[in-house]
């Protein structure tokens, strides 16, 4: 991470979008703090603060694909924020990724190009894993 402009990437190395975002940050010259949240886990307060900073509700940050198998009750309309946060703390895979935090704010970086809004500089060109040039 650069001293004057810290970048934190909440990262899942199995996710192509997350890998692209991390590579974009590094290509822009940053050395980010990488948090592999599947290993470190979350707590509800940490998630609440991160989502508030990113302007997300817990439901908006919920990865529905994983919720279908890990916690299908969260997909019901009556599932509240507290239940979603508790499930995310218990099953970190339920949090959509990647989330990036910088002095400019925090965001769920889907699509991956959203990360550029959080950086002071960007690479001149970047080629994603799938060959797309951004």
Predicted feature descriptions by range:
Residues 2-28, 32-40:
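Local sequence-structure signature of Cys/Sec-based thiol-disulfide redox active-site neighborhoods
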Residues 39-134:
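Thiol/selenol-based redox catalytic cores and closely related redox-interacting motifs
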